[in-house]
């Protein structure tokens, strides 16, 4: 087993070799700007390492590479289209490129974080190509093809080096997380049954939620890592939903215990409360719970406990299948077929995304107008850096710190780049080996710093490689270096100023939208089984976003968790279908979800609670048991009591 320092050294070597190999192949194939291939190889490998705080998994590097290829091709096509249509109106063409960058940033803020890189990249790629060909528009197609070729070459080198030199498979980490999943679920159940330590419940719940979503992210990396894992990926998809279901069941048992302390029989309480320390003990405890359930019978037991034991049994079966990756058997296939495909919900960050797009469009447009008005020689580089920083920084959890990272990197790149540009690179023109060694040393040092998430490390690597004249043939005019370095620094500074000046005050609006989506998900459980879909993963993703936006708001978190529990109880309840009333309930929930004005939302919420109450009264007149109707009454009561959280 390698020590952490050895792992960091291994990744730094792989990063260095990938950058040097892409540079050598760029010179060998006669590409005009081999620095783009070297920069691509460095960024594709270093960005996941910076995000992970260590050596990334092989699947993450390949996924990042595919996103970069898609974004580059999309941006190149947009640049070609704009150049063909507006070649006689350069000002309008550049402003439309700025608008395209803003639209791409807006769209990237609406998709999932791991997919947003392609859209953000396509925005500033179009701007780079158009600005580079502004003086010679007849070479636009050649430049677009060359840039795509250099990008693909850098990605191929990064993936090839990672594959050949000790690739880090995510399968071992998946097995570790999956192996301890049943133990974590059982400990959460123990905390919920005990119910005395609320902080322990919150910690255990939060850890399991994070593990479940981390497992879903690792599943995407595993799918790209090798063609050997399709069965494991299918099982992991079902495990993700099943883990969230067990968490919800445990929280439902906690609420049941709070309302009815004697709901669980004494034998179950004693068996659940007994300590467990290892996954093997958790497996044996699950077998004992199953035997006790068979001996006791399902009468006078909470449905949540019965569902938890059944779900834990299915989870243990899938865990064994993930570890062995054997062929899916008949019983396991039935378990997987029972799992409904997750159904996504619309993004609740529409206002936040609009502000992000506005920031990029405004910053790049002002930079373009100032460049064209002043004729500043470094204006093009400044405008491109504004687009790059605003497109990428706004999708990070802390955009201000991301912009500071770029600014620090551009400041450090000035003396480092000057040393390379004026002394080292001119002295290595007669020896390709010395050139590779000098650039490899720079990449190696940055690779070590990136894994430790040093402030400015990513920006230093990207900015230094960008300002060096790694072209074919190479030249070293000092004016070009000064323009490029100053343009980078001013662009990063202006991007930071825009992020600070254009405030994002969408936090409260996003919080209300999240609560409305959770309420809509709870009401959607009343739909017919074939139309409701599996909303549980989407609801928990929104709950995590709510915790990110309001980390100290325990009341809002409790309300959101209650809505998710009610959604599961309604989804598994045996309520008869009244098509007319369900359509009215669904229409009111849709009106509440769509928002509008305060009066419109208030009216929709009032109509929704009224319809839910009428539906419950109608079912009561039909002789439906009060225990079956309890979740329906609870949902109507929760929506009415907490209406101020859902409304403006």
Curated annotation (Swiss-Prot):
Main location: membrane
Domain of life: Bacteria
Residues forming coiled coils: none
InterPro entries xref list: PHBA_efflux_AaeB/fusaric-R, PHBA_efflux_pump_AaeB
Any Gene Ontology biological process: carboxylic acid transport
Functional summary from the UniProt entry: Forms an efflux pump with AaeA. Could function as a metabolic relief valve, allowing to eliminate certain compounds when they accumulate to high levels in the cell.
HAMAP family: AaeB
UniProt name for this protein: p-hydroxybenzoic acid efflux pump subunit AaeB
Organism: Edwardsiella ictaluri (strain 93-146)
């Amino acid at each position: 087993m390698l020590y952490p320092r050895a792992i960091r050294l291994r990744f730094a070597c792989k990063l260095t070799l990938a950058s040097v190999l892409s540079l050598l192949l760029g010179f060998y194939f006669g590409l005009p700007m081999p620095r783009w291939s070297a920069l691509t190889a460095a960024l594709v490998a270093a960005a996941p390492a910076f995000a992970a705080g260590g050596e990334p998994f092989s699947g993450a590097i390949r996924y990042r590479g595919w996103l970069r290829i898609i974004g580059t091709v999309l941006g190149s096509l947009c640049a070609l289209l704009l150049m063909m249509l507006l070649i006689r109106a350069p000002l309008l063409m550049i402003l439309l490129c700025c608008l395209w960058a803003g639209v791409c940033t807006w769209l990237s803020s609406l998709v999932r974080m791991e997919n947003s890189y392609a859209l953000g990249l396509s925005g500033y790629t179009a701007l780079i190509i158009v600005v580079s060909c502004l003086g010679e528009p007849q070479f636009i197609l050649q430049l677009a093809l060359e840039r795509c070729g250099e990008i693909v070459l850098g990605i191929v080198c990064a993936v090839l080096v990672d594959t050949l030199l000790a690739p880090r498979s995510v399968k071992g980490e998946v097995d570790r997380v999956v192996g301890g999943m049943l133990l974590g679920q059982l400990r959460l159940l123990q905390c919920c049954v005990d119910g005395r330590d609320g902080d322990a419940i919150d910690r255990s719940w939060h850890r399991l939620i994070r593990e479940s979503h981390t497992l879903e992210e690792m599943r995407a990396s595993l799918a790209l890592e090798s063609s050997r894992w399709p069965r494991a990926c299918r099982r992991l998809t079902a495990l993700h939903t099943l883990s969230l279901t067990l968490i919800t069941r445990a929280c439902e048992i906690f609420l049941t215990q709070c309302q009815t302390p004697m709901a669980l029989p004494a034998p179950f309480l004693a068996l659940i409360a007994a300590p467990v320390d290892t996954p093997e003990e958790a497996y044996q405890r699950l077998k004992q719970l199953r035997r006790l359930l068979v001996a006791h019978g399902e009468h006078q037991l909470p449905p949540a406990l019965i569902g938890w034991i059944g779900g834990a049994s299915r989870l243990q079966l899938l865990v064994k299948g993930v570890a062995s990756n054997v062929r899916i058997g008949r019983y396991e296939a039935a378990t997987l077929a029972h799992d409904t495909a997750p159904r996504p919900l619309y993004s609740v960050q529409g206002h936040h995304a609009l502000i992000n797009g506005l920031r990029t469009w405004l910053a790049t447009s002002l930079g373009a107008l100032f460049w064209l008005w002043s004729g500043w020689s470094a204006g093009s580089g400044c405008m491109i850096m504004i687009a790059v920083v605003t497109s990428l920084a706004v999708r990070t959890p802390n955009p201000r710190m991301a912009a500071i990272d770029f600014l620090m990197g551009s400041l450090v790149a000035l003396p480092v780049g000057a040393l390379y540009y004026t002394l080292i690179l001119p002295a290595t023109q007669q020896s390709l080996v010395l050139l590779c060694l000098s650039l490899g040393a720079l990449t190696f040092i940055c690779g070590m710093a990136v894994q430790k998430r040093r402030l400015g490390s990513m920006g230093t690597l990207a900015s230094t490689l960008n300002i060096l004249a790694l072209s074919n043939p190479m030249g070293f005019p000092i004016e070009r270096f000064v323009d490029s370095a100053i343009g980078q620094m001013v662009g990063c500074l202006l991007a930071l100023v825009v992020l600070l000046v254009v405030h994002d005050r969408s936090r409260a609006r996003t919080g209300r939208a999240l609560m409305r989506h959770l309420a809509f998900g709870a009401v959607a459980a009343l739909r017919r089984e074939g139309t409701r879909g599996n909303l549980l993963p989407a609801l928990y993703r929104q709950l995590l976003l709510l915790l990110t936006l309001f980390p100290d708001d325990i009341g809002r978190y409790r309300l959101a968790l209650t809505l998710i529990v009610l959604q599961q109880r309604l989804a598994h309840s045996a309520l008869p279908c009244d098509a007319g009333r369900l359509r009215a309930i669904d229409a009111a929930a849709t009106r509440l979800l769509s928002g509008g004005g305060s009066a419109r939302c208030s009216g929709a919420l009032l109509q929704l609670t009224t319809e839910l109450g009428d539906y419950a009264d109608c079912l009561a007149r039909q002789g439906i048991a009060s225990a079956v109707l309890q979740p329906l009454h609870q949902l109507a009561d929760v929506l009415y009591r907490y209406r101020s959280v859902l409304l403006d």
